[in-house]
A protein has these predicted regions:
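Positively charged n-region of N-terminal signal peptides that target proteins for export
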Residues: 1-4
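Boundary at the C-terminal end of the N-terminal hydrophobic targeting segment
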Residues: 21-23
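Bacterial N-terminal signal peptides
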Residues: 8-18
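Short, conserved catalytic-motif segment at the N-terminal edge
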Residues: 25-95, 115-117, 131-139, 409, ...
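Short, surface-exposed loop or secondary-structure junction motifs
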Residues: 27, 127-370
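Structural recognition of the beta-strand scaffold that forms the well-ordered cores
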Residues: 61-64, 71-73, 94, 161-164, ...
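Active-site SXXK
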Residues: 42-49, 62, 68, 93-125, ...
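Structured C-terminal helix/loop/strand segments within mature extracytoplasmic catalytic/sensor domains
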Residues: 374-421
Length: 421
């Protein structure tokens, strides 16, 4: 097949899928039919409207589905605080780290095909990541000052380590280890003007923050995993998402950028952080990026992400389309930290293969069920799945900064208090 014909065929296939998918939504019913009290759900609306009136949140979309049916799907505030357009249900949001579950699912699809094993050393696919060093901080007894010693990694980083963030990779802007932080700055590991392949070359030059498989450390593990998906599949990460996840699930507004016909639907944040007063800088998403970051670069809508979450709740299947086997989803959504759980920052939760997983009925700071799982994005988005309650919830907002952490337990409590059965 010649290249022009291939391009036309690919374009036709995309248009066909998009046309078919445009009408695909989860069934919408009255709150009571989904097991919710409409009166109690009104508390959620009052609360978010109050947040908007206080100018703490520019706008939001909330979608709550139970037993495969939407019982609550409402919008609040403005699409862009600089304008007057109300928030639409099909608003597009920068989901930041809610890209990570897509990358985790992509990885497990390759595991199911026998192309990856969780015990595989990452260096099998990315040779630059062999023989890494670890930056160990110690106190100099003579001076009392903190000094850093570089020591060899005692074990290989595995695919499982990337999925559960026990690799030793971190985020340079948040790590306390000074030597690691300086190395990330020197080699521009946290930059966005690179490719997925260039990330590996850069991060290979920086030391790990701890020995692999000794602690949870949230960071670039999923970005590295995105490059593994590319190498194993022979596709860019964005193309893999499109062909293997978005098209089958009819997620028509998800990807690594907002196409030319959709920027008017892109939600925006306040220009200043509502807590710190600092300028807010959001990811540029109106043009195709060179860096399709598996851990942070995605955009999506409430409905698109709900379809993805509903697939997970369905243990790998949605509308008859199966992406993963049921045992694989169960395996992903159970705790994989074990004795390392005390290094995970969320009380009452462990971490699976891409998700925080509730392991205790108490301890946590918000309502939920043992076995529920979730993740969030730095821009203010949040979702969770509760298999016990057959519940999928998405909060889509652009509220970066400290305040985003306030809305996560708030929305959980407001949803759970409205359950009738």
């Amino acid at each position: 097949m010649t290249r022009p014909i291939a391009l036309v065929t690919c374009l036709f296939g995309w248009l066909l899928v998009a046309a078919t998918a445009s009408a695909e939504v989860l069934p919408v019913v009255k709150p009571e039919e989904a097991g919710f009290s409409a009166d109690r759900l009104a508390r959620l609306a009052r609360t978010l409207k109050s947040e908007i009136e206080q100018k703490r949140m520019p706008g939001a979309v909330v979608l709550v589905a139970r037993r495969g049916r939407i019982g609550y799907f409402e919008t609040f505030g403005k699409l862009d605080p600089a304008g007057n357009a109300p928030m639409p249900k099909d608003a597009i949001f920068r989901v930041y780290s809610m890209t990570k579950p897509w990358t985790s699912v992509a990885t497990m699809m390759l595991v199911e095909e026998g192309r990856i094993v969780l015990t595989d050393p990452v260096a099998k696919f990315l040779p630059q990541l062999a023989k890494l060093q670890v930056a160990v901080e110690k106190t100099d007894p003579a001076t009392g000052k903190t000094v850093t010693e570089l020591v060899p990694a005692q074990r290989d980083i595995t695919i499982q380590d990337l999925l559960r963030h026990t690799s030793g990779f971190t985020y340079g802007m948040r790590v306390k280890n000074a030597a690691v932080r300086e190395a990330y700055v020197q080699h521009r590991v946290d930059a966005v003007d690179m490719t997925n392949a260039e990330l590996i070359d850069r991060i290979a030059k920086a030391p790990l923050v701890h020995q692999p498989r000794t602690a949870f450390e949230y960071g670039r593990s999923t970005d590295v995993l995105g490059r593994v998906v590319e190498v194993v599949s022979g596709m860019t990460l964005g193309r893999f998402f499109e062909q293997r996840i978005f098209w089958p699930l009819k997620m028509v507004d998800s990807g690594f950028h907002v196409p030319p016909d959709k920027p008017a639907r892109l939600a925006q944040a306040f220009p200043k952080d509502v807590v710190s007063g600092r300028d807010v800088r959001m990811l540029a998403v109106t043009a195709p990026p060179t860096y399709e970051a598996g851990g942070q670069g995605g955009v999506s809508t409430a409905m698109d992400y709900a379809r993805f979450a509903q697939m997970l709740l369905g243990r790998g299947v949605l509308d008859g389309t199966r992406l993963l086997g049921r045992h694989t989803v169960d395996f992903m959504t159970t705790d994989h930290l074990g004795k390392m759980r005390d290094t995970f920052p969320a009380a009452g939760y462990g971490f699976g293969l891409g998700f925080a997983v509730r392991v205790d009925p108490g301890v946590a700071t918000s309502a939920g069920s043992v076995g529920d799982y979730n993740w969030a994005g730095a821009g203010g988005t949040y979702f969770w799945v509760d298999p016990k309650e057959q519940l999928v919830v998405g909060l889509m907002a652009q509220t970066p900064g400290e305040i985003r952490a306030y809305y996560r337990p708030l929305i959980r409590d407001l949803v759970y208090q409205a359950l009738l059965d």
